Amino acid sequence: MARKTPIERYRNIGISAHIDAGKTTTTERILFYTGVNHKIGEVHDGAATMDWMEQEQERGITITSAATTAFWKGMGNNYPEHRINIIDTPGHVDFTIEVERSMRVLDGACMVYCAVGGVQPQSETVWRQANKYKVPRLAFVNKMDRTGANFFKVYDQLKLRLKANPVPVVVPIGAEENFKGVVDLLKMKAIIWDEASQGTKFDYVDIPAELADTCQEWREKMVEAAAEASEDLMNKYLEEGDLPEADIVKALRDRTIACEIQPMLCGTAFKNKGVQRMLDAVIDFLPSPVDIPPVKGELESGEAAERQASDEEKFSSLAFKIMTDPFVGQLIFFRVYSGVVNSGDTLLNSTKGKKERLGRILQMHANQREEIKEVRAGDIAAAVGLKEATTGDTLCDPAHPIVLERMVFPEPVISQAVEPKTKADQEKMGLALNRLAQEDPSFRVQTDEESGQTIISGMGELHLEILVDRMKREFGVEATVGKPQVAYRETIRSTAKDVDGKFVKQSGGRGQYGHAVITLEPNEQGKGYEFFDEIKGGVIPREYIPAVDKGIQDTLKSGVLAGFPVVDVKVHLTFGSYHDVDSNENAFRMAGSMAFKEAMRRANPVVLEPMMAVEVETPEDYMGNVMGDLSGRRGIVQGMEDMVGGGKIVRAEVPLSEMFGYSTSLRSLTQGRATYTMEFKHYAEAPKNVADAIISAKSK
């Protein structure tokens, strides 16, 4: 089967934005204009084609990035047919993992901003991620019909907040309810869309007189930006005072792909204006798979290698998303970087070192699907029948193994206990949690050995809430979620010398007799428990000494203050006595345990709490609020530094118990413009008032 669309005409793009910037509506319009779905789905009534999980439709936010293929010949049929693969990315901070994951497989991105709200918090996070993966991008200012819409204000915010270099290629005609269309600065013509045909037809008309000066000014800025692409162009521009359209497009394209500039457009997806011109810009300015550097990887020998985006190259692809589909089971979304693969071929999962047969290949359109026989370099598709693959795995030709760069996923920051509501839910819950953890690498499941509870951990409170919700909807498991819990520990601060432990039972016949004397002292942090046998002259027979050690180890599981595990102590067994007839292992275990409990009471026991290393990235204006709040949470600020592209990073150590509800309060403190990460650092002694509260809570 030959290739339908030459790879130069592929555009793999992501559409990403802050919640409510109108991203889903924008994607919907793209699908409508590219002729894929003929009735437009509106988010307002929960019918958008891309948002296909039930919760998304209820919450009106996009959670999972669905991948869709569309075709475009240009607004006025002025291009050969291009193939656009769109990855829809979520705009909520608790789903940053999804955004990060889709950035990895994109060639370009279209950032959607609200003409009223401008650059919002998540936009900053997404922008940083796009910088990290060097993704070329366009900016689309949506909702130009809303009260308070201001295209030029958003232009200023892009420069100021994101340190971006936006280059408008259109300017709006009117704003708010008077928004009519846009002026195309390349053609210097106004574009007015026909409302009756939902924007599928349009006319080029003369620029309204009142906009002539504005358009001239912005055209000059655009041509200057193009001229900076090369010395030759700059000289041509200086000589002639202008540049031909073809030169401008090529120069802006080169600079966009080099991440030096971001072409900027505007419109209102809801009113069918501007998205069509933005699609043309995707073709004009965003890269095809051959315009960006070849994907890098590692061979079995550990050598670095590259794979060119070509059908002739050996097959390599990356699995970037797993979804459970109610009809076909598990779908693995993958991006083909090089080569060709057919359904039925055997692939090597080089990340895990396992071979698997590729079953069916599906081309996804939001939630409809078309079965295809092969995929080629540049394609994004979904595979059915791969059992082993998880997010971030490389799937490649077994004869030519390569591991593409691995994705790095953040550690979860919040944990909660989940309990099934009924016995019947018990087994299903284990299955459901494992399936969800497979789909989402930032979600972990473990069993707490101390309490026997199942503990789930994730990226934020909303993240866990949605996973528990999915468990109920997709797997029919009802579960109750506990309050987030903290794992405390106990240790000692001083030494207790020569403490006796004597276990004696004489009750006629054979009795029990064990006697051990120990010295207990603090150990270095992180060293755990150590036992030293210092018995001289056989006062305790050799065979009973391990029993004393075992008795102490049993007692370590539950300390004397509040029953938390005891850490970092040294025990010296120094003396004892025995009875020829009555002594046995059990008696010495009991003696060891009694001696340890008594010694611990005397050795100034304390409660330890987990301390977290917290990093907050915040705009400078909110710095004071953030620092004040961290100190209020018993945090110790350890340092600050400037962020590349504005803003500050605050590093602090904060007790885990004080961090519950933090993502919510940080959001309100900084109007959602700050993000934070936290990971476990070490255990530290809890202040007396805190320790007392913990002990009394535990004893209830």
From Swiss-Prot:
Residue ranges annotated for the tr-type G domain, each copy included: 8-290
Binding site for GTP: 17-24, 88-92, 142-145
Alphabetized CDD domains for the sequence: EF-G, EFG_III, EFG_mtEFG1_IV, EFG_mtEFG_C, EFG_mtEFG_II
Keyword match Nucleotide-binding: yes
GO molecular function, one term: guanosine tetraphosphate binding
Pfam family, one: EFG_C
Entry's family note: Belongs to the TRAFAC class translation factor GTPase superfamily. Classic translation factor GTPase family. EF-G/EF-2 subfamily.
Function: Catalyzes the GTP-dependent ribosomal translocation step during translation elongation. During this step, the ribosome changes from the pre-translocational (PRE) to the post-translocational (POST) state as the newly formed A-site-bound peptidyl-tRNA and P-site-bound deacylated tRNA move to the P and E sites, respectively. Catalyzes the coordinated movement of the two tRNA molecules, the mRNA and conformational changes in the ribosome.
Listed name of the protein: Elongation factor G 2
Native species: Burkholderia mallei (strain ATCC 23344)
